[in-house]
Amino acid sequence: MSQAKGLKEVSYVDIIGGGQVTIQGNYCYIAHMDAPAGTSILDISDPKHPKQVAHIPIPAGVHTHKVRVENDLMVVNWECPPPYIHDDSFQGGMLVYDVSNPAKPKELCFWKSAGAGVHRFDFDGRYAYITPTVEGYHLNIAMILDLKDPTKPEEVGRWWMPGQHVAGGETPDEGYRLTWCHHILRRGNRLYVAYWHAGMVILDIEDMSKPKLVSRLQYSPAFAHPTHTVLPMPFEVAGRKIAIVADEDVRKLRPSPPAFMWLVDITDEKQPVPISTYQIEGLENRNMPEFSGCHEPAEQVYSTEIPVAWFEFGLRLVDVKNPHAPKEVGYFVPDTPSGFDRPQTNDVFLTKEGLMYVIDRNRGLHILERA
């Protein structure tokens, strides 16, 4: 039976699990985790009664678990499924669709990358900020694509961690610190980049053709988990500029308690400083299997209450109005989907109206609101 505090369910959609959910207008777009399920589109004009209007299947051996929609364009990643092992016949990249009629998505192009493909990205309707594997580079790097002509995306610029450009004579610092670009969020002329075990990175993209490093913060290997998402708050909190930094509860360097969330002061963006953390009470000293702890926050927030997808422990609502002492003010832990051993809350999208669209990576979409 589901458990909730401070949140209540508006509706539930029994649908194949997903990696990301995004809302644009009256439509919900779900990028699924596993083939043959690719991307589903739901009419949510009545959030109490969502209706599926389209589905795009994919072939076996492909992973399209991320989706973004802006300006009637839908962008979907195309990569080799985990553990990202593939032969030379695999073609990774990114798909672009026209969704001016969401019930009839029309493919516009398939942008090709080398290697395993594109993992995650941000998209503002013109530019895509992607994390592709690229010929001559060790694992994924940061890249900016211009979709002015969505049938022919063009690279504008790229950035990589020193050591990744093996074709240029650099040597990757592998060891236990897997260095690759995991996720990017754009805010103004800055990119906030999660670089896995290499930490968080802030890039200046005033000149998009030449992204420049502003700063970097790394706390691995001292802490066992990789950095998943860097979300700058859209307003000052207690007079300071704050970033919500989520570690992901996977690929940990050693047995440890589940991953947690950091609050990082970026008032001086050249010197980001961690000032607090949030962990679910009672988990601080418990060694647990992967996919138990923190995953990622909603990437659009409108108050100090941050919805965070927390894998086995559902959705946690964390108030950061005191950035030195974040406090849980609500939670929703769904029922375990049939055929699985625990919930796996993977992603959440928060609307301006306060609805939270919460997708389980195995099965089910819950639409929630504050109680």
Residue ranges and their predicted role:
Residues 1-371:
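Feature marking well-ordered beta-strand scaffolds used for ligand recognition
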